[in-house]
Amino acid sequence: MMARPWNFSAGPSALPEAVLQQAAAEMLDWHGSGMSVMEMSHRGKHFVQICDEAEADLRELLGLPADYAVMFMQGGGLGENAIVPMNLMGRRSTPAADFVVTGHWSTRSHKEAGRYGDAQIAASAAEATEIDGQAQSSWTWLPPVDTWRVRKDSAYLHLCSNETIGGVEFTEWPDPASLGAPDVPLVVDVSSHFLSRPLDIARAGLVFAGAQKNAGPAGVTVVIARRDLLGHALPICPSAFDYANVAADHSRYNTPPTFAIYVMGLVFKWIKAHGGVRGMEEANRAKAELLYGYLDGSAFYRNPVQPAVRSRMNVPFVLRDESLNDAFLQGAEAAGLMQLKGHKSVGGMRASIYNAMPLAGVQALIDYLKEFERRHG
């Protein structure tokens, strides 16, 4: 078997090798059933066990109270940009929601919600600014909470707590009451830092995460919603995307992505075995500090994000001489460092160092960064 490269993809991303090995070992025969998980009825006893166990493990990892429903859905984070407003805007006589726009994904969330109601921007990082005497370009900073303007009659306030492309991260979420809107629930897209650190989900009415970054393979989306927010879907909402239906049938209202849920459940067990979410946080802090420390000490590379809001998961950086980009990527692949190219909307490079990336992978990247700088600096 060839040595596995270090995979820095933003998603679908690297999975823990132990999870892949277990899935491979059980591919043809899950626990003596004689069937692959891919062949099981989603209503049969075997898959019901898999699905219920995954939910129980997730609840344990997050310390979720009973008044939150857990749903394993389809459509990805982008799909939730439509599913959320179709489910929550019906809470108000006039469909409306507010958005904190801090990058690519929250911009798309705001735009999509506008198809279903009045979507307004409560705060934005779309313009350049100056912070602590340092110039910050658009999408490299976060608007202070005291500048947010939230309507008291909004159905919800949306934010993306980790912008995968821009590499900015909210470490804390505000209490809507502190914004003068105590009846406006917080909706948070946590896709790219889900399970990477403790999150105060009790402050949110709903969170969602595409699994393909920290929680599993592409194809399943985790939605965690306070139960009092269910049952308000707009008439236009398809029944399969109505949270009330999905929650009532324990994620089996229609055929769910069974194999993706199974693998995700294995990831949950892997996280539990490695110290839970606190264990992930400690490892992720160490990786991020190591990588940012090197970038900040280099005159050859640069990370554009305001240091106080840098993501631990997604680290964008640019070469001072962009004419070297292609050579950098070719050399990285030859060294076994894969998928470092930045998103097409911003260019440059990006290292996504999710839970499954060990410290050794980050050190291998830094070793390559040093060598490339030595040869081209």
UniProtKB/Swiss-Prot annotation:
The gene is serC. Transmembrane segments: none annotated. The lineage of its organism: Bacteria, Pseudomonadati, Pseudomonadota, Betaproteobacteria, Burkholderiales. It comes from Bordetella parapertussis (strain 12822 / ATCC BAA-587 / NCTC 13253). The keyword Cell membrane does not apply. Keywords: Amino-acid biosynthesis, Aminotransferase, Cytoplasm, Pyridoxal phosphate, Pyridoxine biosynthesis, Serine biosynthesis, Transferase. Homodimer. Its cofactor is pyridoxal 5'-phosphate. Gene3D superfamilies: Aspartate Aminotransferase, domain 1 (3.90.1150.10), Type I PLP-dependent aspartate aminotransferase-like (Major domain) (3.40.640.10). The keyword Amino-acid biosynthesis applies. InterPro entries: Aminotrans_V_dom, Pser_aminoTfrase, PyrdxlP-dep_Trfase, PyrdxlP-dep_Trfase_major, PyrdxlP-dep_Trfase_small. This is Phosphoserine aminotransferase. L-glutamate binds at R43. It catalyses: O-phospho-L-serine + 2-oxoglutarate = 3-phosphooxypyruvate + L-glutamate; 4-(phosphooxy)-L-threonine + 2-oxoglutarate = (R)-3-hydroxy-2-oxo-4-phosphooxybutanoate + L-glutamate. It comes from the Bacteria. The modification N6-(pyridoxal phosphate)lysine is found at K213. GO terms for molecular function: O-phospho-L-serine:2-oxoglutarate aminotransferase activity; pyridoxal phosphate binding. It is found in: Cytoplasm. PANTHER family: PHOSPHOSERINE AMINOTRANSFERASE (PTHR43247:SF1). One of its GO terms (biological process) is pyridoxine biosynthetic process. Catalyzes the reversible conversion of 3-phosphohydroxypyruvate to phosphoserine and of 3-hydroxy-2-oxo-4-phosphonooxybutanoate to phosphohydroxythreonine. Binds 1 pyridoxal phosphate per subunit. Belongs to the class-V pyridoxal-phosphate-dependent aminotransferase family. SerC subfamily. It is an enzyme of class 2 (transferase). One of its GO terms (cellular component) is cytoplasm. Pfam families: Aminotran_5 (PF00266).
